[in-house]
Amino acid sequence: MKQEQVRMAVLLMLNCFVKATAPPPWPPSASSASFLDDLGDLGIAPLIRADEAGTARASADFGNLSVAGVGAPRLAAAAAVLYPSRPADIAALLRASCARPAPFAVSARGCGHSVHGQASAPDGVVVDMASLGRLQGGGARRLAVSVEGRYVDAGGEQLWVDVLRASMAHGLTPVSWTDYLHLTVGGTLSNAGISGQAFRHGPQISNVLELDVITGVGEMVTCSKEKAPDLFDAVLGGLGQFGVITRARIPLAPAPARARWVRFVYTTAAAMTADQERLIAVDRAGGAGAVGGLMDYVEGSVHLNQGLVETWRTQPQPPSPSSSSSSSFFSDADEARVAALAKEAGGVLYFLEGAIYFGGAAGPSAADVDKRMDVLRRELRHERGFVFAQDVAYAGFLDRVHDGELKLRAAGLWDVPHPWLNLFLPRSGVLAFADGVFHGILSRTPAMGPVLIYPMNRNKWDSNMSAVITDDDGDEVFYTVGILRSAAAAGDVGRLEEQNDEILGFCEVAGIAYKQYLPYYGSQAEWQKRHFGANLWPRFVQRKSKYDPKAILSRGQGIFTSPLA
């Protein structure tokens, strides 16, 4: 009874807060007015806003592409926003939608880091997941580390950077990350969650012990590989189509204290990718060779006329005292040498970027890292004299992209349109892609953002989960490419989107069987043909029919926009 009284008091306080802070109410569209009236009869009514400021914010995302004014927005704005105080509020909303003859769309929104409106709910309700950690003082209770069990229970709304901090306080850490940690647990697990650790540990979805999920029919389910495994596999990498993740149990390992952050410079894609593949050759038939497994993190990037916007992702913080340049990983003298090498190489260089973790309870010593570096310098086929290294805090290395974000925000270059393109490529097509795209399409214009390229091991991915990677062509290795550009000037968005289309067209002509990561397609037919294919589409539809038959969830993805049953 006391608990319910506290809840009602919180609802009343929130209702007063919303009324005090919201601008004048925004009239809902005719299509949404009736269901908004119905929601007024629910116990969650005080948690719902339908004002223009709230719905506009919930309908925007990191991509900012509709804001850029290039063409018409692909999706209508949300009609309302739910600010839940507990998972049961989300379940009540979904049951209310499911009970209607014409169900309204519902989408969970974490940090809004999608780039094509994937988390939008056209004429429906966006769920502001961050509210779960704010209301009732519940943030701490929704992020709990079990030292004995070696896991962390994190609410779906929790940021990975906070998961890191909570775990590190106990000398522990998750092992698989994204490069940017200011994303929600539920958001990355709905896609895959990849970074330079994925070659060894798999994506984040391969590192989950248990989930709490609310399905499209409003059922609250705890699932794992042992309990409701089909739902567990469906939700992980499921693009928000089968349920809302409200809790994830993530395994932990002893945390290192430091990271040796290194860059090896190459003049050809062939040399760099060959070395990357040697470095990730762990747990593979044929052995790891002299360098396999020596690094804990392996990525790579393409150097194309870099400036602040292009290098923000991998700048150490604070800057080296010996450097006044915008790219503080290098001294001024080293940056001049790299620029000269780039000119000799025709304007394109490749950086193999890696890290070796050390210190802490179970990590190697600094002396052991020095020995590994000696082997790497000797064995890798980089340009001699072009190896750069810094020792940084482990947590600082993982959160390095945030430092770049702060620099871009200070320069007014963060909240701009981001027409990003992320691809998975078969190993057989990566060199043709490098030749046609890095040395062709992208070389004709300024880079305007980081360009990443690195390999992963197929056997670290679970094919029962919903995430889609390149077709199994018998090759253990496949690649991810991230072309992460910012449209800072007028006219950039249209030009960059046209260039993205040109890149995809090049892949089609060259026979490179790519898959989009963080995908965006304009129709269900394209999703079926280009993304899932004949083998995976039937399973995806079957799971949708089972867990969200009225296609309420995540309509912004454009996969299902009308009920299946």
UniProtKB/Swiss-Prot annotation:
FAD binds at A108, G110, G112, S114, Q118, D179, T184, S190, I194, I245, Y517, S554, Q557. It is an enzyme of class 1 (oxidoreductase). One of its GO terms (molecular function) is oxidoreductase activity. Glycosylated. It is found in: Secreted, Extracellular space. The modification Pros-8alpha-FAD histidine is found at H113. Gene3D superfamilies: 3.30.465.10, FAD-linked oxidases, C-terminal domain (3.40.462.10), Uridine Diphospho-n-acetylenolpyruvylglucosamine Reductase, domain 2 (3.30.43.10). Its main location: secreted. InterPro entries: Cytok_DH_C_sf, Cytokinin_DH_FAD/cytokin-bd, FAD-bd_PCMH, FAD-bd_PCMH-like_sf, FAD-bd_PCMH_sub1, FAD-bd_PCMH_sub2, FAD-linked_Oxase-like_C, FAD-linked_Oxidoreductases_BP. Residues 74-255 form the FAD-binding PCMH-type domain. It catalyses: N(6)-dimethylallyladenine + A + H2O = 3-methyl-2-butenal + adenine + AH2. Pfam families: Cytokin-bind (PF09265), FAD_binding_4 (PF01565). Catalyzes the oxidation of cytokinins, a family of N(6)-substituted adenine derivatives that are plant hormones, where the substituent is an isopentenyl group. Is a major QTL involved in grain yield. Modulates the number of reproductive organs by regulating the cytokinin accumulation in inflorescence meristems. Acts as negative regulator of panicle branching. Belongs to the oxygen-dependent FAD-linked oxidoreductase family. This is Cytokinin dehydrogenase 2.
